[in-house]
Design a protein with these regions (language model features):
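Periplasmic plug
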Residues: 23-26, 31, 42, 59-113
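Short, well-structured beta-strand/strand-turn elements
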Residues: 47-57
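Transmembrane beta-barrel wall of Gram-negative outer-membrane proteins
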Residues: 139-141, 146-230
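Short, acidic, small-residue-rich periplasmic hinge/interaction motif at the N-terminus
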Residues: 1-30
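Solvent-exposed coil/turn segments that connect beta secondary-structure elements
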Residues: 26-27, 48, 66-68, 78, ...
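A beta-strand signature from Gram-negative outer-membrane beta-barrel systems
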Residues: 91-143
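Mobile, glycine-rich extracellular loop/lid and propeptide segments
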Residues: 57, 69, 80, 89, ...
Length: 231
């Protein structure tokens, strides 16, 4: 994508941004992942990001060598709406704007707590997730996925615009996934529904995004590290 949202500076061409900036579109997510897989699989296409797990139960990755997770992500410019064990669901994302390096002046200070992954550390950059909105063309998509030993998922995506000039838009996205993962005895149940309402006026755009998200993991694995000393 040739443009990205840079905090208080608004939408800018990536060629005019004085930072290392990358914008990943919905097409990128479709190419490198699917709705049942962790977002980190897509993020690692950015050269400053490395994924520390391929597990669909967590969103653990590093940027410039510093551990990060869903805590560090912004949703439509708002920080701290997600948490360590999972970031934004893939199926609600229209675009991800990734800014590497110090940029608190334009994006503010993002969450720095890594939870059980090592405590608080300075955020090495920001990841702003932009959610899907209703476009000019109506959308009606239904997707099924199968992964692990018996994990079955269903996803729905519906959008319409209405009004005399199509000024009102609504988009509804939902998911239900349940079953056994590849790790023996590990189970995951995930269900969510999100709605995006927007109005495009002559001089302004208003957008409201809301949803409900529920994730339950049973007997999931966690990573470990070696201590700094041995006796």
């Amino acid at each position: 994508n040739q443009t990205a949202k840079l905090g208080i500076l608004g939408n800018k061409s990536v060629m005019d941004i004085p930072y290392s900036e990358m914008s990943m579109t919905e097409k990128t997510l479709e190419t490198f992942s699917d709705p049942s897989q962790p977002l980190a699989n897509v993020l690692q296409n950015n050269p400053s990001i490395r994924s520390s797990t391929s597990s669909p139960m967590y969103t653990d990755f590093s940027m410039r060598g510093i551990n990060m997770n869903g805590n560090h992500m912004m949703l439509n410019g708002i920080p701290s709406l997600f948490y360590q064990f999972n970031g934004p669901p893939n199926h609600i994302i229209e675009r991800m704007d990734i800014t590497s390096g110090p940029n608190a002046g334009v994006n503010g200070v993002s969450m720095s707590n890594n939870g059980t992954n090592g405590g608080a550390t300075p955020a090495p950059g920001t990841i702003n997730v932009v959610t899907k909105k209703a476009g000019s063309t109506p959308v009606l998509n239904y997707t099924q996925t199968f992964s692990g030993r018996s994990s079955f998922g269903e996803f729905i995506d519906v959008s319409r615009r209405t009004g005399a000039n199509g000024e009102w838009g609504v988009r509804v996205m939902g998911e239900y996934m349940d079953g056994d993962l590849a790790l023996r005895h590990a189970e995951k149940e995930e269900k969510n529904i999100f709605i995006n309402l927007d109005r495009k006026g002559e001089t302004s755009v208003t957008n409201i995004f809301a949803g409900s998200f529920d994730l339950r993991v049973n007997k999931g694995q966690r990573w470990f590290t070696y201590g700094g000393r041995s006796d």
